Amino acid sequence: MDALSRLLMLNAPQGTIDKNCVLGSDWQLPHGAGELSVIRWHALTQGAAKLEMPTGEIFTLRPGNVVLLPQNSAHRLSHVDNESTCIVCGTLRLQHSARYFLTSLPETLFLAPVNHSVEYNWLREAIPFLQQESRSAMPGVDALCSQICATFFTLAVREWIAQVNTEKNILSLLLHPRLGAVIQQMLEMPGHAWTVESLASIAHMSRASFAQLFRDVSGTTPLAVLTKLRLQIAAQMFSRETLPVVVIAESVGYASESSFHKAFVREFGCTPGEYRERVRQLAP
């Protein structure tokens, strides 16, 4: 069994449909940041929708597109034109420990297969079938819907991996037999004063061998990945907590608020305060 399959089966995603939305010409669906081990997903079946994220990114969804939010980030869906829009909304609940795995994924995953591909044909039939089953009282309906929702997630992760260099992302590190434990420790204790030496000791490797293996797998350095994860965790906290910036900065390993501020701007293109304001505006 491959590493991704083991990870997905270990966390056993449990999926549900929450809403079948039929929307008019002027609408908004705001969503606040939620529990970190829960994935929200939206499938567009008619019309078009705009998806706004706290980073300032804006995406347009078309019929047949499915978007999943692995970090349960704040977001807002809204109308694009005056046409009516139909959206199926649901969630996937994973084991609490899956929040570390989910943090290694991007904030948004899209399932938009190439026309007439096997995945496209399956998805075109799966969404209406899922809607029909969710309205029925047939035996096994909950299990069936859950498995279809989980398949959305698996296909979306696979599609994302296919679009990026599979040897150059944090997920590849998490799935690596020697480096996975290192990433796990970074995620569990972002505020620890990690050094390359202390990280190498987790992998039971020399500093030089560890640094070389890490670069071979990720294309970057251990401390660069640590910085990225620390800032991602900080962004998650800004979306969910009202703690002062300095407290959050210290909790993810920054002794100086100014250095944290500069790093956050480099990563997200906005200040911590601006990020919080964007989250507030997306889900007032």
From Swiss-Prot:
Keyword flag DNA-binding: yes
Listed InterPro entries: AraC_lig, AraC_XylS_family_regulators, Homeodomain-like_sf, HTH_AraC, RCS-HTH_transactivator, RmlC-like_jellyroll, RmlC_Cupin_sf, Tscrpt_reg_AraC-type_HTH
Keyword Lipid metabolism (UniProt): no
DNA-binding region (UniProt annotation): 197-218, 245-268
Domain HTH araC/xylS-type residue range list: 177-278
Alphabetical keyword list: Activator, Disulfide bond, DNA-binding, Stress response, Transcription, Transcription regulation
Up-regulation conditions: Autoregulated. Induced in response to HOCl.
GO biological process assignments: positive regulation of DNA-templated transcription; regulation of organohalogen metabolic process
Pfam families: Cupin_6, HTH_18
Phenotype when changing H42A: Increases expression of the target genes in the absence of HOCl
PROSITE patterns named among the record's database cross-references: HTH_ARAC_FAMILY_2 (PS01124)
Notes on activation and inhibition: Oxydation of Cys-21 leads to partial activation of RclR, followed by the formation of an intramolecular disulfide bond between Cys-21 and Cys-89, which stabilizes the active form of RclR.
Phenotypic effect of disruption: Mutants are more sensitive to HOCl treatment than wild-type cells.
Disulfide bonds: C21-C89
Listed NCBIfam families: chlor_reg_RclR (NF040475)
Function (record text): Involved in reactive chlorine species (RCS) stress resistance. Up-regulates, in response to hypochlorous acid (HOCl), the expression of three genes essential for survival of RCS stress (rclA, rclB and rclC) and its own expression.
Protein name per Swiss-Prot or TrEMBL: RCS-specific HTH-type transcriptional activator RclR
Organism: Escherichia coli (strain K12)
Gene: rclR
